[in-house]
Amino acid sequence: MNYPNGQQKVTTNHVVQKQDNRMFSNRGMSLEDDINATNEFYLETNQAVIHKKPTPVQIVNVHYPKRSAAVITEAYFKQASTTDYNGIYKGKYIDFEAKETKNKTSFPLANIHEHQINHMQKVIDQQGICFMLIRFTAHDETYLLDAKALLTFWNLKQDGGKKSIPYDMIRNQSQLIPFHYQKRVDYLAAVDKLYF
């Protein structure tokens, strides 16, 4: 096409192909979404009863136009006091935290709060099954790390040690959880290997 000043529009057909080196498993889903879908499958197939604990909310302001139509106009999330998930599996109490990291070389212990560590220790003291699911999004891998191992890394950090768990250590001391269509994060298979 010729424009009034006599110049032609130059078109360039640059097609940028984004190389997608992710495995089929992630497909944009978060770890929490994957765990929730897996827990729903476990519940429907009578394998386990495990639920996500709701995040506590502090309600600040409520508008009451009439008694039956109260509307919360201001609220804030409180910091959760324990771990993300709990329930029962094969007659045993199960309790775990789930975290994702974009870090390729380590899992930062700053992602865990001291109150969560204290809660995990109490679960262990009562002979419950306790662990952390860690997803390395850069590797598209999810691992189950036993809480006792996590507590060891945490205590080393408290004594001036490393502030993160190296990826290679997690690979060596954890169970890799494969992706399945219905059981996206089939962590009970890893629980069976570690605890039963």
From Swiss-Prot:
Its EC number is 3.1.21.10. Binds 1 Mg(2+) ion per subunit. Endonuclease that resolves Holliday junction intermediates in genetic recombination. Cleaves mobile four-strand junctions by introducing symmetrical nicks in paired strands. Promotes annealing of linear ssDNA with homologous dsDNA. Required for DNA repair, homologous recombination and chromosome segregation. The record marks 99 as: Transition state stabilizer. Its cofactor is Mg(2+). This is Holliday junction resolvase RecU. The keyword Cytoplasm applies. GO terms for molecular function: endonuclease activity; magnesium ion binding; nucleic acid binding. Mg(2+) binds at residues 82, 84, 97, 116. One of its GO terms (cellular component) is cytoplasm. It is found in: Cytoplasm. One of its GO terms (biological process) is DNA repair. SUPFAM superfamilies: Restriction endonuclease-like. Keywords: Cytoplasm, DNA damage, DNA recombination, DNA repair, Endonuclease, Hydrolase, Magnesium, Metal-binding, Nuclease. It holds the Pfam family RecU. It comes from Oceanobacillus iheyensis (strain DSM 14371 / CIP 107618 / JCM 11309 / KCTC 3954 / HTE831). It catalyses: Endonucleolytic cleavage at a junction such as a reciprocal single-stranded crossover between two homologous DNA duplexes (Holliday junction). InterPro entries: Resolv_RecU (IPR004612), Restrct_endonuc-II-like (IPR011335), tRNA_endonuc-like_dom_sf (IPR011856).
